Amino acid sequence: MSNRVIIFDTTLRDGEQALAASLSVKEKLQIAMALERLGVDVMEVGFPVSSPGDFESVQTIARTIKNSRVCALSRALEKDIDAAAQALSVAEQFRIHTFISTSTIHVESKLKRSFEQVLEMAVGAVKYARRFTDDVEFSCEDAGRTPIDNLCRMVEAAIHAGARTINIPDTVGYTVPSEFGSIIQTLFNRVPNIDQAIISVHCHDDLGLSVANSITAVQHGARQIECTMNGIGERAGNCSLEEIAMILATRKNLLGFETGINAKEIHRTSNLVSQLCNMPIQSNKAIVGANAFTHSSGIHQDGMLKAQNTYEIMTPESIGLNRNNLNMTSRSGRHVIKHRMEEMGYSSQDYNLDALYEQFLHLADKKGQVFDYDLEALAFIEAQAAEDNFYQLRQLVVQSDSTEGVATATVRIEVGGEIKTEAATGNGPVDAAYNAIARATDRRIDIISYKLGAKGVGQDALGQVDITAVYHEQNFHGVGLATDVVEASARALVHVMNLTCRADKVADYKQNMHKNRELGGV
């Protein structure tokens, strides 16, 4: 048996079912092209009979994708299969995926038929789909709760009818790894023609076991895993593609399997799916979460600086990230501060490490994570000046025209002790406030990230706005808190303006430092 595991991505079919708003055809095509670069073997891109929009998107993707096999879903009905075949007919290579429920509860309660009738429908659907392509996949929906005798009969009949791939879904995420592995093993032991098809698995994450069940299934003979990027999908989601790919790559010494996934595309593809689907990735998500390669513990950071594999079982570069992050927090030791200063190009003669570390701990206790620009300000600006705010928001008044969508904001800002008042318009109240603040401070920055959240609960809750902005090719992170979202946004921007002001002071200091070095060397 081959050790190659086929990666069947269903982000654009099962994954999209979890979205509050449907993706456009253009957005689906963007994701499909990213999945092709990622190296998925098969991509299931829609359910053509469900709507004209889904039909169009399947057809568009089928016409464009060349290196992955494009697949469409259909129920065990001729009209569904006709729609799938028509939408896919423009593809260079395609698969029709047809399915029917096989568990007792589904057969009796949903389909209201006997198992024998369902078996006949399944065989008929596979034979009908074979008229359009020899690549037909058949799924036994809710296989995890199907009586094993019935499941064996269904699999044998579907293979005999012409199905090349048989999918065994844990549709409701009910099974545990030992149980699911036993189901797969029993199929291999009892289905006489099982060697004529690829056994696939499609596991949901209702109990958090989708990845574990999929890996166990492969160990018992399955050779296709159905999954989605970031694990998105119905209810608690699907098996995560990125987790499967990196488990099989990282533990190849133990498991002995390989895939065709280009792991260096994982990070980029994950971000694209997150952005287009408007589904943020939890920070502690395995492989692709913001904290996946971030180290905050001083002990861990010390180990990482000595040897990366002390606390990393895979490298961030392997999934397309530049490098790990050593978060500077109150738990970080002197060695991390010294390392960051060296990374920024400073020698130990440029600053006093002991004094810097003491100031760093004071700031870290107040704000949590400390960034590079904070460290530079502490090192080269007087301690109090490094924390003083040159800009302070004193008043914000916003007026909005609900019909035109144009808003006007007036701000009173204290600039180095002097009050300045400016007004500006914008596309909405937040944009207007930003424009007015930019005028008052005479600073221009590019905002590249805006996140709205809440701090506290009930009546005590405050709106929290986190922004990331670019100034002179450096990223700055600002936070604003207020009962009003517009005010919180304005305070976040003023926070960034103060950070850039300190950065300018640091730049002046560095320039003078370099001049003094040159003069000293003459």
UniProtKB/Swiss-Prot annotation:
It is an enzyme of class 2 (transferase). It comes from the Bacteria. InterPro entries: 2-IPM_HCS-like, 2-isopropylmalate_synth_dimer, AIPM/Hcit_synth_CS, Aldolase_TIM, LeuA/HCS_post-cat, LeuA_allosteric_dom_sf, LeuA_bact_synth, PYR_CT. Residues 392-522 are annotated as: Regulatory domain. Pathway: Amino-acid biosynthesis; L-leucine biosynthesis; L-leucine from 3-methyl-2-oxobutanoate: step 1/4. GO terms for cellular component: cytosol. The keyword Transferase applies. GO terms for molecular function: 2-isopropylmalate synthase activity; acetyl-CoA C-acetyltransferase activity; manganese ion binding. Its cofactor is Mn(2+). Keywords: Amino-acid biosynthesis, Branched-chain amino acid biosynthesis, Cytoplasm, Leucine biosynthesis, Manganese, Metal-binding, Transferase. It is found in: Cytoplasm. It catalyses: 3-methyl-2-oxobutanoate + acetyl-CoA + H2O = (2S)-2-isopropylmalate + CoA + H(+). Its main location: cytoplasm. GO terms for biological process: L-leucine biosynthetic process. Pfam families: HCS_D2, HMGL-like, LeuA_dimer. Catalyzes the condensation of the acetyl group of acetyl-CoA with 3-methyl-2-oxobutanoate (2-ketoisovalerate) to form 3-carboxy-3-hydroxy-4-methylpentanoate (2-isopropylmalate). HAMAP family: LeuA_type1. This is 2-isopropylmalate synthase. It comes from Shewanella oneidensis (strain ATCC 700550 / JCM 31522 / CIP 106686 / LMG 19005 / NCIMB 14063 / MR-1).
